Structures are given as C-alpha cells and as structure tokens.
C-alpha cells in the first residue's frame, strides 16, 4: 500500500530519478546509477555475503536503490525494477535461494512486477502524481545529477545517491553486509520487500521523526538534495521519506511551495511526523542535528532517539517499551527511524548511515529501515509492519493507502513468506539481536556500536549486542540459530515490544482505526500469547523461534495475506505478524491466525489464536525444544508425548483434534510458518504454503528455508526447520513439526529446514508442500519445497493434485491429516510426517490419510521431493528438511519436520508417502499401511523410494527437485538442504552436515527426540504398534524427524545427530549444543549453502560438505563418538532409547513393522545408536545394535538389517537376493524401512538405514535375522516379504521396491534374479539428476576416495566390528558387508548405501535411497560417492547412482534417510571422507549407515 504507493510513487520518482533524481533528492540517492553500483556492489555484497548480508546488502542495496523508491526493497526492486531487481534477483538468486527464491522471486517477481508495475504502473499510477513526476523529473535531474555527481565523488556515502550507494555499497558490505548477515538468514531480502515496504511504512512514522533529522540532514544535504555532501551528516541524517512525504515534497517543489524537497520536508512534517514529530522532531531535530554534529554512528544513534520519538507515538503506546522502543526505535527506528535508526543503526556505521543515507536516499525512508531495516528487518519488519501500516496509513491518499495496503499485503505476504521466515529470523535475529541488532545484527559490529551508542533503547533491546553480533553471525550462519537465541530472549520480549512498538509505531501513522485494530490485535496477540503460554506449548518463544525459525519461514503470511488475515491482521497483523518480534503474537498470528487465518479461515484464526499460541507456542516450544530443533523435537516429543502423548501433541492432539483444525492448523500454521520459513529458507524455500508458500515460497526452508532455510529455516528451519528450521521448529520436531512440522515440518528449517528448508524449502516447502499438498506434507512440503518444491509441490500439490487432492485435502485437511499423522503433533506434523503419526496416523491418517498421504506419497514423492530437497531432509525427511526446518528443516527442514517433519514428517510423511508409496507401491497397502507404517516408516525412505516411486511424482517433483537438485544438488543440497531445509539451513551443509546429521539427526534426533520421545513417544506411540510402527517410527521418525527438525536446525541436527546420537536422551541437549555450535557454521554454511548453494553447491556444497563433514560430521563425530560409547552404553541407552524404542518398536513393532519400523524406528532411535554406531557405527551400532538387536536391536537390526542385515549382510549379497532382498530391502526397505524408516526416520532410517543396511541390520539380522527378517521381512516382508524374492527387486525395499516399482525407478532399477536391483544408469542418470548425480558423482568420486579411505577405515572399523561381533559380522557384513561388501561388494558396503547399493541392490535401493539422499544433494554427493563406490564396488555405481538419482529423487525425496542415507552415504562418504569417525560420528547416521556400511 504505502509501500506500494511509495513503491509506486517512489518507483515513479525513482524511475524518474533514474532519469533524473526525483524531487526526492534524498531519494535521488537512489539514482539508478547508485542503485546499480549499489546493486552491483550489492550483488557483490550480497553475493559476497549472500549468507551474510546478502539479504541486507541486497536490501540495502536494493533498498538503496529502491530506497529511493520507497525504501522498500521490494519497492527498490520495483523501482530498480529490472535493474535493482535483476540485481536484486541476483541477490535474490543468491538470496532467494537463501531467502526463499520463490518468495523472493515471487516477491521479486511480484514486487518487481508490482514495483515494476508500481514503477511502470506506479509511474502511470504516479502519473496521477504528475506533479510529483514532473517534479521528480525536475528534481530528479538535479538530484540525480547531484547524486550522480556526488556519486561520482568517491561515494561520499553522504550523498543520498552516492552515500547510500557507496556507503551502502561499502557499508552494505558492512552494514548492509551486517544487516544482510542478519537478513540473508532472515530472508531479509524478502523481508526487505516486506520490510522495506514496512520500512517505508515505518518510515512513514519514522519520516516524521526522521524528517526532522532529515530536514537537518537535508540542510546538510540540501545541496546534495540529500546528496548530503556532509556525507556523514546525511549518513547521520537518515531522512526517511515516506513516499507520501517524498511525493508531497516533490509536489511542493514542483508547485514552488518549497525551495527544495529538503526544505519542504524540513518545513513540513507529515501527520505521522507530527504525531511523531512532536516526539521525534524535538529529539530528532536536535538529535539529528546533533547527530549531524555527532555525524557518527552516535549521530545516528541520536537519530535513534528521533526514531524513538518516531515510535514516539508508539512509546506512549509502548512506553515500557520506550527503551524497547528505543530499541524498537533501534529496531523500529532502524525500521521506523530507519533513517535515524537506519542512520543510527544503519548509520551506526557511516556506512550504515549510508544505509541511513541510503535511507536518506530513501526519502520514503521505508528503505532505510530496509537497509538498516534489513537488519531491521526483524525490527523494521515488525516496526515496518506497524510502521508500514503506520506509514501506509500516514500520508497517502485513500487510494494510495488502499494500493499500499494491497501492496503491503502483498509485501506482507512476501514478507511473511520471506520475512516471515526472514522477519522472524530477523526479528528473532534482529529484534532478538536487538532492533539495532536487527539491522545491527547485520551490523553486528556496527550494531555493537549502535546498540551501545544508538541503543539507549537499542541496547536495551540489544541487551544482546553481542547477540546481535552472534545474531549476525548466526544470522549469517543460520538465522535460526540467532533468532533463536536472541529470538528466544528477545523474541518474545522484543517481539512483543517490537510488535507493540511496531504496532504503536504503526499506530503513529496508523489511522485511529488502524490503531484500534492494532491495539486489538496486540491485545489479541497478547491474550493469545498468554493463552499460548498457558497452553505452554512451550513458550511462544519456540514458536517464535520456531516460527521465527520455522515460523519465520512459515509465517502466517500466506494465510494472512492470502486470507486477508492481513486484512484481518492488517498491517497490525503484518506488523504484529510481521513482528516476529512478537513472534509469539505476531508469529503466532503470523503463523497462527495469519496463517490459519487465511489458510484456515476463521477457524484457524480462532484456533490459531489458541493455536496461534499453540502454534506459536508449539512452534516456539519446538524452538525451545527445538531450541534446537533437537530439543524441541524432544520438547515437543517430550512435550508432545506428554502433551500429545500418543497424540504426541496433547496440545496438538487436542488442538489437533480440537483443531485438528487447530493442531493441524496449528501445525499447519506452524508448519506453514515453518514452511514459510522453509520456503523462505529454502529453505528453508519452499513455497511454504503452497498458496503462499508455494507462491511465496519464494523464500524457499531457505532453510533454503533453509533454512530460507533453512532454514533458517533451519530449520529449518533452522530451521527444521529449524528447521526447518532452521530450523528449529523442525528441530523441535514438535516445533520441528512446525519447523519440523513447519520447518520441521518445515524445521527446516527443518527445517526443514526446515523447511526443508527450504528446499529451498522444498523441504519445508516440501513439507509444506506436503503439508500443503498434504497440507501436512504439503505444508511441510511447501515449507520445504519452497520455491522449487513449492513449485513442484505446487505442481505436485496441484500436479499431484491428487496429492493435493489428498493433499489437496485442504491444508487443513492435510494439516489434519498431518495433525493426525502428527497425531499428535505438530511435532506430529512433523511427526505427523512422522511415520508415527504419519505412518500411523499418517499412515493411517495418511495412510488413511494416505490420501493425504497418498497424495503424500505421491506428495510424499513430493514430500520426499519436497523433503527431498528440503524436506528431503525434512522428511528426511520427507520433510527432509526443515531448519531447518526447517523442516525443512533434513531431517530438519530436513524433513522439517522437514527435518523432523521431514524426518518426522518426512518419515511420517514420507512413510506416509512411502506408505503410500509402499502402499502405493503398495505392496501391501495395508500391510504397508501397517507395515507401511513401517513401510511408511521406511516408507519415508521407501517413500523416498516410494516417493521416489512417487518419484514419478517425486521424480517429477523430485526430479524437479532433483532437477532442482541437479541444480539442486547444488540447489538440491540447497533444496535438499533447503529441502532439508532444516537440513537446508544446514541444508547443504546441514544436508551435508546437518542433513547428514540432520538426516541422521532425524535418526539421531529421532533417536534423541524420538529416542526420548521414542521411548516415551515411541513407547507412547509404540504402544500403538501400528502407530508404533508408525508411531514408533513416527517417534523415531519423530525423533528422526525431530532430529530432522534439528536437522532443520540443520546444524543442530547434525550436532543433534551427534547429540542425538550421542544421547538419544541428550540429543536435544547435545544436539542443541552441537547444534548451536554447529549451527553457526552449519547454519551459516547451510544457509549460505542453501542460499548460495545452487550455484555454489558443488564447490560450496563440497566445501560445506567438507566443513559439514569436518565440522558437523566431525563434530557429531565427537559427540557421536562419545555417543558411540554411550550408544554402546548409551547406545544401549540410545539403544535403549532406541532399543527402547527399538524394543518398544521392536517389541511393539517388533513384528516386522513395529519392530522393524520401530526397530528401525528404534533404529531411528537407534540410529542414534546407529548413528552412534555411526561413530561407533560398528561398535555402537553393533553393541547398540546388539542391544537394539537383542532388544530392539534385533528388531531393529532385524528390521533394519534383518531384512537387509544379517541376511543381506550375512548373505549380504546372497540374501540380498532374498534375504538381502529383504535385507536389502530392509537395507533398502529398511533403508526404505530402515532407510526409509531411517530415512523416514531420517536419521533412523539412515541410521537404521545404516544399521539396517549396515551394522545394525547385520547385527540385528544376524541376531534376529529370522525374527527381524521376518519382522523386517515382515516389515520388509511387508514391503518385502512378498518382494523378498522377487518382491525384493520389486519389493526389495518397499522403498526400493517402490523405487524398483517406481515407475521411474522401475526403468532405472530393474529387479534382478538376485534381488539386487540393477539400476539402469543410462536411465537413471539421465533420468533424475544426471548432472546432479554426476556432479555428486564426481563429488562422490572425490569423496569416495576419501570415503573409501574412510571406507577403509570404516572397513577396518567394520572389520573390527565384524570381528567384534560374529553376529555383527553380518552386521558388519553390512559393515562387513561393507568390508565384505566392499570386499564383497555385494554385501553393501554401506550395506545399504554403498555396498548395499553396490553390493545389494536393495541396498542399492537403499543406497539409492541413501544415494538418493546422497544423491539428493549431499546425499547425492554421497550417493554419488556411494554410487561411485558402488560403482566401483559394484559397478552399480552408475546404476546405483542411477537409482540414486532416482532414488535420489525418491530418496532425496526420501529426505532424511536418503539424505541421511545419502548423507549417510554422502556423509558417510563425506564423513568417511572426513573421517570414519566423523562419518561415523557425523555421517554416521548417514555416514554411519553409509559409513558403516562402507
């Protein structure tokens, strides 16, 4: 609206500016030239700090250019239109990948379009403002010349034109960079548009205050026309002109009423200004003037004070928040007083001032917030939202206001998509970091300054200046992390404050009605928050985080703006929503009402409130728990179990039930948010909600959400999602569910990311998509899917409309399914994804809900896809990511649920998918149902395969995903990552790392999460054998998924995996810890990877892989290594956990499914063991497995390996045909089962996969080959029993079978008499992602060598292991198989993975799955590696590879397991590459599997 109006007008002026500086000479700063330089630099900055400040940079740059425009990035984009936007698009490309290409692209496209339209239209529109135009043209020439001339000057940085450009260019690197740092992670780019839009709005209010300063500045820069010769003063004075102001000034100048725009502005304070001016001008003027004197960041901090006045109005509303307001002002002011704060915060550095200058140049000032606001994003965004409304309402004509409102809504949508994830992240980050931190986070360094200097309030808010920096770093690394940290602390607080401030600020400019509305909203939010808090879904923070992380991603934007919650939640909502600051509320809103609002009209709105809270809470909880996705997973799982117990989300259950609307909405909203996040991330990131997400999933979980994710989110989702979160939510599978579910579903973050994250949130999107598609899954898919997947999902959702059908169920329905699946949980959603719910519920729900899931399966294919990329992880989960994510979240966004979702969801989802797949694949649909629960469980894997099968779908989606993945390997990693979302967030890395971890995370996390929940939930769930299977799996998956969620967190997942692995119980803690540690790098890499990955993937991915491997893998390795022992001890613990689960599972599910699944699930849990075993893949796994074996291990192994295990391993290759088939199947199936389950379980699958395929299975198999095999066979048999012999090839794995059966795969993989599927490389490679595959293949080659040495190492380990356990030998055989496999190729080096792949086709199936995973992205790499190895070993490499591509798809789709497996494989390889231990440790899950297997 205003933004648009501004945008439109500005673009107009800007456009004119392009020709000539518009009267808005301050805007003049935006001359194309500066903009361009800015953009180029921006590009540079952005590219350079894609992860970093790309977002901010872009925003700032874009904003700068656009700043002129409206200071709305979007506007800028519009203004810059093609130019900025294109550059922005580049940034966007980078960023979009980060921010969620879809959303941003969407944003970009939308914004660009709108802006272009605004620009063009705007010009025409503005034509209505001919005087402005004329003036703009008149002034433009002057200003422009001035700017240009000044710009020609060495970028005084003072000049509006030049300053922002140069300074912003420079500063953007610094400030923008900083901001960007926060932003990119935050998806500020998108935030930018929204934020910018908001900022303009903010600026509207800010303009008043800032106008004071601006006038001062203008005097300083009068000659410069904002040229701001006193470069610093302009820097110091950030004149934020609303479009209205700028236009008015221009008009006045044209009319001769004013000498200059500056004079006019100085003389005339807009209403907002007057509202604020009294508050601001006094301070602002003096301050700004002083500031000029201060002329330094101090000066800008003073501007901050003006912004406080700007918020001044807000202060009254927000007096307590006065400091917060100051902070808000720091935050908002960055946003609102963007000029000031922008100047202050932004101007903290002269560069920031440049930002401020840019802001100045952005007379609309909307941009300043955007520029600093980028950082402000969180701040500005919230503020922006409020201010946006504020501004939006401020001086525009009714028409413009309406337009602006629409634009705002659009922006808000985008914001929510992008910003939601970005915003929340920024919010979490920036706001958490501090408002200044928001910007400052970007400018952490500067933020440090501004916070100190500017921070009267800023500091207060910035209690976290360091955090700001951290935020920045994390922002960089993984916003999910940051925002979680800051977000949590400040998220709620600040969020509220910010929100309130925003609202209040917004109120400044807002009309009384709006103010009233806002107030109501605030009250509503607060009430909701209280409710939520009461709901205790776990503090809104997690939601915030989740939302922030995943939620961010999966903000409610889609619903809100789609549904018009925006209308309902007008700016307030936007603001509030947008203010992830008030993440809880806003977030809630955003996720909840907004989310639900539109998405679940009314209902959700209503519910969301509760669920908003719930959503928020859960999300937050997960965030909390997910705090790292891991914990959230646990938290949720724990909580869930407690809460949901069986339902897994009591709340959810209740809510879900209550609302399955709610829960599901909850979930959905959350998931959606996560998704969004993933989308954003990826992503996250995925198009989070298909609608928005899909569309908006520009973000995309990421974690590209994710993890935009990715991530964040990181999930997710970070984002699982965390993500994905990103995490996060993802990680908190519960949250994860959000993230995991959302991101997780998306956690991504994980998202995947996370939200998958982002596959870009494909994961999340995937999840989202899934969640959307399945609503559950679709949502997740969407979240995970984000852009690609979003698209895919869209297609799939739409295309697989059937999925959509089922998935299309409605988001609600899907969500419901998801909810049911999630049964309990959001986590459920994640978990829903979780086989648990998913399988169980999912299976039932999805199985029954298979509709949904059938769709899911198909969708799952998507989901896998979605997950695959993002939610591959998420699912990885199906929601493979997150953030992480998201769900994305890798399992986080990975499966954002992604991760968790992915895993959870992925698992669940995927299992669902798988189940469906399997069901579909069907082998015994019912059996599958039940078994498929297993199947589903492995289904996830299988699903992956199935999904793979779905592959048709998946392939289609997946392929796209893969395609995305091919690019996607790059992207896929991203997507995968994103998809992993969570994984994505760690996406690539996560995917690599997190995915590895994440997937493993899911496994591990599953272990942890599930492990804990597993036992609890698992037991909980397990009791329901079905559910057990499913549930257990779900649990495991949940665990896995939650891990995914962690995966969403990506980093966390990896850590989590370690942790998870490390402590099934501890997982969360450990994971979280590792996650955090991992997160920064992991997330950062993930996010970077996620964002940058597409192009960088190979290099970056490899680097990430390396880093991930080194870092995460090693890291997990360490944890894992310790865990291994623990797994041995703990393994038992884990094993217990897992075994527990395993036992539970095994016991409950011991039967083929329960046990297998559970076994797998336990495996999943055990994957921690397995994972641990990873580290101790042999040892832990063995012992663990033995434990598991004896206990659940048997089952587990049995399940895992049993089918593939001893048999396969034993007769790794012998049985491969039959037992191995089964085994293979188990490996594969198991992989599908174990793998799938693992995959589904994410880690579990992976682990299971690994165990299944590897030690565990062997061991288990040996121990329980009969039982397990039967069970597994049962499981497998379910999928594989029949298939065992022949079925094996076909039923080799449900997943593999699916894969084999997969229409696409069928061509590629053809059952052989031996039961070893042969992969027709010619088909496959060309098939899904030849390049990706190839790429990875080479990667693989690189790693394979590495891998092989590690492999050798592994072999040694395995040998040791083999020697260790006679029983193990089989297991080892798996491992031994590796050895043997290696030696005996047939055995499946990674029984599943490599060898399995190589040795055992089933394993290949698995491997494909694994490869798939590997193939997916990192997985792919691994896959490739595996394949490579396989190829080498088996010569199946190609085939395997082939399958992997296929499987990849599916497996990618497979998410965790695949990713895990892939990761496992990839990681294994990678990890192997990195280190056996690492691989074992990190990859162990994936690596473990592959590793061990290898």
Swiss-Prot record:
GO cellular component: beta-catenin-TCF complex; fibrillar center; nucleoplasm; nucleus
Bias-annotated ranges (Pro residues): 20-37, 279-289, 299-322, 1119-1129, 1165-1176
Residue(s) carrying N6-acetyllysine: 36, 108, 110, 137
Residue list for modification Phosphothreonine: 511
Gene Ontology process terms (BP): canonical Wnt signaling pathway; myoblast differentiation; negative regulation of transforming growth factor beta receptor signaling pathway; positive regulation of epithelial to mesenchymal transition; positive regulation of transcription by RNA polymerase II; regulation of cell morphogenesis; skeletal muscle cell differentiation; somatic stem cell population maintenance
UniProt modified residues of type Asymmetric dimethylarginine: 677
Subcellular location: Nucleus
UniProt biased composition (Polar residues): 45-70, 85-96, 193-207, 932-957, 974-993, 1016-1035, 1060-1082, 1133-1143
Residue numbers carrying Phosphoserine: 21, 25, 88, 116, 118, 421, 747, 810, 912, 923, 935, 939, 944, 972, 984, 988, 994, 1001, 1007, 1014
Keywords, comma-separated and alphabetical: Acetylation, Activator, Isopeptide bond, Methylation, Nucleus, Phosphoprotein, Transcription, Transcription regulation, Ubl conjugation
Top-level taxon: Eukaryota
Covalent link (Glycyl lysine isopeptide (Lys-Gly) (interchain with G-Cter in SUMO2)) residue numbers: 1339
Classification via InterPro entries: Bcl-9/Bcl-9l, BCL9_beta-catenin-bd_dom, Znf_RING/FYVE/PHD
GO molecular function: beta-catenin binding; transcription coactivator activity
Principal subcellular localisation of the protein: nucleus
UniProt tissue specificity: Expressed in kidney, liver, lung, testis, brain, spleen, heart and skeletal muscle. Highly expressed in numerous colorectal tumors compared to corresponding non-cancerous tissues.
Compositionally biased spans, kind Basic and acidic residues: 114-126, 134-153, 396-418
Keyword Ubl conjugation: yes
Keyword Protease among record annotations: no
Residue ranges, annotated region (Disordered): 1-236, 269-496, 905-1082, 1113-1206
Subunit structure: Found in a complex with CDC73; CTNNB1 and PYGO1. Interacts with CTNNB1.
Role: Transcriptional regulator that acts as an activator. Promotes beta-catenin transcriptional activity. Plays a role in tumorigenesis. Enhances the neoplastic transforming activity of CTNNB1.
Family in the record: Belongs to the BCL9 family.
Free-text comment about domains: Tne C-terminal domain is important for its transactivation activity.
Name listed for the protein in its UniProt record: B-cell CLL/lymphoma 9-like protein
Organism from which the protein derives: Mus musculus (Mouse)
């Amino acid at each position: 609206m205003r933004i648009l109006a501004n945008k439109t007008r500005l673009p107009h002026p800007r456009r004119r500016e392009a020709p000539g500086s518009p009267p808005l000479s301050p805007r003049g700063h935006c001359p194309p030239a500066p903009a361009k330089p800015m953009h180029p630099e921006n590009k540079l900055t952005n590219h350079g700090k894609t992860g970093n400040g790309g977002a901010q940079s872009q925003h700032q740059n874009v904003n700068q250019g656009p700043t002129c425009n409206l200071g709305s990035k979007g506007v800028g984009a519009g203004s810059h239109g093609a130019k900025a936007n294109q550059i922005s698009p580049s940034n966007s490309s980078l960023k979009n990948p980060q921010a969620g290409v879809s959303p941003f692209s969407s944003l970009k496209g939308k914004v660009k379009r709108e802006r272009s339209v605004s620009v063009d239209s705007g010009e025409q529109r503005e034509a209505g403002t001919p005087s402005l135009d004329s003036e703009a043209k008149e002034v433009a020439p002057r200003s422009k010349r001035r700017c240009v001339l000044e710009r020609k000057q060495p970028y005084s940085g003072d000049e509006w034109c030049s300053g922002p450009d140069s300074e912003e260019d420079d500063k953007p690197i610094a400030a923008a960079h900083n901001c960007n740092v926060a932003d990119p992670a935050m998806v500020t780019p998108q935030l930018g548009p929204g934020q910018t839009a908001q900022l303009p709005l903010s600026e509207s209010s800010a303009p008043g205050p800032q106008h004071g300063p601006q006038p001062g500045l203008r005097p300083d820069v009068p000659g410069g026309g904002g040229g701001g010769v006193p470069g610093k003063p302009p820097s110091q004075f950030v004149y934020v002109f609303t479009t209205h102001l700028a236009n008015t000034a221009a008009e006045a100048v044209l009319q001769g009423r004013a000498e200059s725009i500056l004079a006019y502005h100085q003389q005339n304070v807009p209403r907002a200004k007057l509202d604020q001016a009294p508050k601001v001008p006094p301070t602002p003027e003096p301050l700004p003037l002083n500031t000029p004197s201060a002329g330094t960041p101090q000066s800008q901090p003073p501007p901050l004070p003006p912004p406080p006045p700007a918020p001044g109005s807000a202060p009254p509303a927000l007096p307590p928040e006065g400091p917060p307001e100051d902070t808000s002002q720091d935050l908002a002011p960055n946003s609102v007083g963007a000029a000031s704060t922008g100047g202050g915060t932004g101007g903290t550095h002269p560069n920031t001032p440049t930002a401020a200058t840019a802001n100045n140049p952005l007379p609309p000032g909307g941009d300043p917030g955007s520029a600093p606001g980028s950082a402000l994003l969180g701040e500005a965004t919230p503020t922006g939202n409020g201010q946006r409304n504020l501004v939006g309402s401020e001086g525009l004509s009714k028409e413009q206001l309406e337009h602006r409102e629409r634009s705002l809504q659009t922006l808000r949508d985008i914001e929510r998509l992008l910003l939601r994830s970005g915003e929340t992240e920024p919010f979490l980050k920036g706001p958490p970091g501090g408002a200044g931190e928001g910007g400052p986070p970007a400018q952490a360094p500067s933020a440090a300054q501004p916070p100190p200097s500017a921070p009267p309030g800023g500091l207060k808010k910035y209690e976290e200046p360091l955090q700001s920096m951290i935020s920045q770093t994390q922002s960089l690394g993984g916003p999910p992390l940051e925002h979680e940290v800051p977000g949590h602390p400040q998220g709620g607080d600040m969020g509220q404050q910010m929100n309130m401030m925003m609202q209040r600020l917004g109120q400044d400019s807002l009309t009384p009605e709006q103010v009233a509305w806002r107030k109501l909203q605030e009250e509503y939010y607060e009430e909701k928050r209280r409710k939520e808090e009461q709901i205790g879904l776990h503090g809104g923070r997690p939601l915030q985080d989740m939302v922030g992380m995943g939620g961010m991603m999966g903000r409610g934007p889609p619903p809100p703006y789609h549904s018009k919650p925006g209308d309902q939640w007008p700016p307030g909502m936007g603001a509030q929503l947008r203010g992830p600051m008030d993440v809880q509320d806003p977030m809630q809103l955003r996720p909840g009402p907004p989310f639900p609002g539109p998405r679940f009209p009314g209902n959700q709105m209503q519910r969301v409130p509760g669920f908003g809270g719930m959503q928020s809470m859960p999300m937050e909880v997960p965030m909390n728990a997910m705090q790292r996705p891991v914990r959230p997973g646990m938290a949720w799982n724990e909580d869930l179990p407690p809460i949901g117990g069986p339902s897994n989300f009591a709340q959810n259950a209740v809510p879900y039930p209550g609302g399955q609307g709610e829960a599901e909405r909850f979930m959905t909203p959350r998931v959606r948010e996560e998704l969004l996040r993933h989308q954003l991330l990826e992503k996250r990131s995925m198009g989070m909600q298909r609608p928005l997400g899909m569309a908006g999933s520009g973000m995309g979980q990421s974690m590209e959400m994710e993890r935009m994710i990715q991530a964040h989110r990181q999930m997710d989702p970070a984002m699982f999602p965390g993500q994905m979160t990103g995490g996060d939510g993802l990680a908190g599978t519960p949250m994860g569910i959000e993230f995991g579910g959302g991101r997780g579903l998306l956690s991504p973050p994980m998202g995947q990311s996370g939200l998958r994250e982002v596959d870009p949130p494909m994961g999340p999107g995937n999840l989202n998509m899934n969640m959307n598609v399945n609503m559950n899954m679709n949502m997740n898919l969407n979240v995970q899917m984000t852009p690609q997947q979003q698209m895919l999902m869209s297609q799939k959702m739409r295309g697989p409309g059937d999925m959509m059908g089922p998935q299309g169920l409605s988001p609600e329905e899907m969500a419901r399914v998801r909810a049911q699946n999630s049964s309990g949980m959001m986590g459920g959603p994640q978990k829903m994804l979780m086989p648990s719910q998913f399988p169980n519920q999912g299976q039932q729900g999805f199985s029954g809900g298979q509709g949904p899931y059938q769709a899911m399966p198909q969708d799952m294919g998507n989901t896998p896809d979605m997950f695959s990329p993002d939610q591959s992880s998420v699912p990885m989960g199906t929601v493979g990511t997150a953030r992480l994510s998201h769900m994305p979240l890798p399992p986080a966004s990975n499966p954002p649920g992604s991760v968790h979702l992915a895993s959870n969801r992925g698992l669940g989802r995927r299992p669902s998918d798988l189940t469906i797949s399997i069901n579909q694949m069907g082998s015994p649909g019912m059996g599958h149902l039940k078994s498929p629960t297993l199947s589903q469980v492995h289904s996830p894997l299988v699903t992956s395969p199935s999904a793979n099968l779905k592959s048709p779908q998946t392939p289609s989606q997946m392929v796209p995903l893969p395609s995305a993945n091919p690019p996607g390997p790059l992207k896929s990693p991203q997507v995968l990552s994103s998809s992993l979302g969570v994984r994505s967030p760690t996406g690539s890395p996560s995917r690599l790392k997190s995915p590895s971890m994440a997937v493993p995370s899911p496994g591990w996390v599953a272990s942890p999460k599930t492990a804990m929940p597993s036992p609890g939930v698992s037991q909980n769930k397990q009791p329901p054998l079905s559910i057990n299977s499913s549930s257990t799996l779900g649990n495991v998956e949940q665990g896995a998924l939650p891990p995914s969620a962690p995966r969403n967190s990506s980093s966390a997942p990896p850590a989590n995996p370690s942790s998870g692995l490390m402590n099934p119980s501890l997982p969360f803690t450990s994971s979280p810890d590792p996650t955090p540690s991992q997160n920064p790098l992991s997330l950062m890499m993930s996010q970077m990877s996620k964002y940058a990955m597409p192009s960088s993937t190979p290099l970056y991915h490899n680097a990430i892989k390396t880093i991930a491997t080194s870092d995460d893998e090693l890291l997990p390795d360490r944890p894992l290594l310790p865990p291994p022992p623990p797994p041995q001890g703990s393994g038992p613990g884990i094993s217990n956990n897992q075994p527990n689960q395993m036992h539970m599972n095994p016991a409950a599910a011991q039967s083929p499914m329960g046990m297998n699944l559970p076994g797998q699930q336990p495996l999943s849990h055990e994957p921690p063991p397995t994972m641990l075993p990873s580290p101790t893949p042999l040892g832990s796994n063995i012992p663990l497995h033995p434990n598991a074996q004896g206990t659940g291990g048997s089952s587990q192994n049995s399940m895992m390996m049993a089918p593939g295990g001893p048999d396969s391993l034993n007769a790794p290759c012998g049985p491969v045909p039959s037992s191995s088939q089964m085994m293979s199947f188990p490996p594969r199936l198991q992989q599908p089962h174990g793998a799938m389950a693992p995959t589904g379980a994410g880690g579990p699958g992976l682990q299971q996969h690994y165990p299944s395929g590897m030690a565990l299975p062997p061991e288990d198999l040996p121990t329980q080959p009969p039982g397990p095999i039967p069970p597994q066979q049962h499981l497998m048999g379910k999928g594989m029993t029949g298939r065992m012999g022949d079925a094996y090839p076909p039923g080799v794995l449900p997943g593999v079978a699916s894969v084999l059966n997969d229409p696409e795969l069928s061509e590629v993989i053809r059952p052989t008499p031996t039961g070893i599927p042969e992969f027709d490389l010619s088909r496959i490679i060309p098939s899904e992602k030849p390049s990706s595959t190839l790429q990875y293949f080479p990667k693989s080659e690189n790693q394979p060598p590495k891998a092989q040495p590690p492999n050798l190492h592994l072999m040694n380990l395995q040998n040791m292991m083999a020697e260790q356990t006679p029983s193990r030998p089989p297991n080892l055989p798996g491992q031994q198989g590796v050895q043997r496999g290696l030696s005996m190729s047939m055995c499946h080096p990674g029984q599943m993975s490599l060898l399995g792949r190589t040795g055992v086709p089933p394993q290949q199936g698995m491997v494909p799955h694994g490869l798939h995973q590997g193939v997916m992205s990192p997985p792919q790499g691994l896959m490739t590696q595996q394949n490579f190895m396989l190829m080498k070993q088996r010569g199946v490499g190609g085939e395997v590879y082939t399958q992997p591509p296929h499987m990849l798809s599916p497996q990618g789709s497979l998410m965790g397991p695949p990713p895990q497996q892939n990761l496992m494989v990839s990681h294994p390889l990678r990890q192997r590459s990195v280190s056996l231990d690492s691989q074992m440790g990190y990859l162990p899950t994936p690596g473990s599997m592959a590793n061990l297997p290898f």
